[in-house]
Amino acid sequence: MKSNAILAVVVLLVALSPLLLPTYQVTLLNYIGMNALVVLGLVLLTGVGGMTSFGQAALVGIGAYTTAYLSVTEQLPTFLAWTGGGPWVGLFLGLIITIFSALLVGGLTLKLSGHYLPLGTIAWGISLYYFFSTIPTLGGHSGIANIPSIEIAGYALDTNNKMFYLIWLILLIAMILTRNLLNSREGRAIRALKGGQIMAESMGVNTFRSKMIVFVTSSVFASIAGWLYAHNQSFINPTPFGLQMGIDYLFMALLGGVGSIWGAVVGAGIFTMMRQWLQDVLPMIFGGEGNYETIVFGLMIVVLMQKSPAGLWSLLLKLLPTRYQLKGSHLSLTPTSHTLAKPTLPAHGTEILQALDVTKAFGGLIANNQMNLNIRAGEILALIGPNGAGKSTMFNQLSGVDTPTSGDVIFLGQRINGIPSREIAKLGLSRTFQHVKILPEMTVLENVVIGAHLRGQRGVFASMFRLDREEENILLNEAKQQLERVGLGEYLYTEAGALALGQQRILEIARALCAHPCLLLLDEPAAGLRLKEKQALAELLIKLKSEGMAILLVEHDMDFVMNLVDRVVVMEFGQKIAEGLPYDIQNDQAVLEAYLGGAA
């Protein structure tokens, strides 16, 4: 509600601006709106998705040059002549070309990671810039002039005041669609890209698909901004679509807050106004022409990254009275009688998983050496061993995070070696992690509902236009039910990063249960828990076992393990040294020497 109130106030102020401000300032607001649209795409791509791009300006150029060419050229090529040209055809074809380009470029560059990804965006950004500069049909360095204004039902938007409303209406729609997307099943998958990709894949999220969604969406925003720019200016040349402008867009995102929708508007506004002012003032101070504003912006970004890495929007929020401050995401959650379909679990005693001579080598280090184990439905199996024995490595191979160097992993009768973890999750395996993998800035409820990702069906467009509300409510209620089941029902809207470590481990269990798996892998679930919490966890696992779920756990608390599990497998130096009932393991001489410190 508070976000909607801020939106209403901003919309009112923006709507009145052309009536109250001189033409020059309205023109400046038009540039702010167009820049903010590009930066909004960077909020999705860089701030939320964690993918840095220096090439957004080139995507703006695709939209601008497409509409300019179609609007100005009198004799269009045969394959385009049937369209008749014009601004609206330019918008349509510009979006098609942009989406095709984004799919092509994204398919090549989004597989890169680390510093290679931004270097890749620089490469294709420069390539597109020189394409615009050297193609004679596009005017070369001289550009394209006499671009006609946009017409709506015969009404020409031939002044800055008239263009103002179209620019800001499109920006407003883009902001609403972005907000809707981020507060959805697809949006949570996107938000997991930054720091949670292994977890997301293990929950069934196709992270490459999510990256492509973000990249294409941000490219579409940039292309529309280019379309607006061309018809607002009536003239374009390659200069605004080069690497320098790509860097400027990133700076705007950082300035306002790269992870905030409102930060896109704030960053674009402050940068655009400051640049204009500095370009007028600094030459008078220093004498002569020069890009002095670049020095100021460089100093600003250094100070900002030290004092407010979240950008100026977060600082502005802190200045508001407490009652008006936005308190994170509060998802709409209403009781419902509808529930998610639950796949039938295999019958008790059915063999769920087998590991056959599984070996994992990292160079010359053998982490797992011909490991064998199996687990059946309705059974709790413990995998124990000293630190460094290779237990978590084994977990990663069973769940698809790693691929065995040799040997086979059989899950429900299917060999799963080399299958991505998201595909194994579809078969009915869910897991937690030795080192907790949560999204700390998201609420507990949002973190847990990621586990139900595979149980939802609605996609990007349904999310943007809020056609997914019924399914979304069912998913959220499933997450709420699992949180109540594990004892975290009172923390639904608490930021996950604010929970104690033990509670975060319980959160991971709730998230895994949201997938309704037939096999649950728990990596040190009792670490950090107090006695009563361990007792509650044991009761939960026993109940899950009685329902037919197979549970494989790694744990160092021997009292917890020996009083809970049906069988135990013991590892040392990557090998299995013992397997049997808890009583037998407790009295096994090899285990006592290797793991429990020798015979008493």
Protein language model regions, located:
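Transmembrane alpha-helices and adjacent helix-loop boundaries
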Residues: 1-336
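The feature captures the beta-strand-to-loop junction immediately N-terminal to the Walker
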Residues: 384-386
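Helix-to-loop junction immediately C-terminal to a conserved catalytic motif
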Residues: 399
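Conserved ABC transporter NBD signature motif
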Residues: 407-415, 427
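Conserved ABC ATPase "signature" region
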Residues: 459-491, 539-542
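Catalytic Walker B motif of ABC-type/P-loop ATPase nucleotide-binding domains
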Residues: 520-524
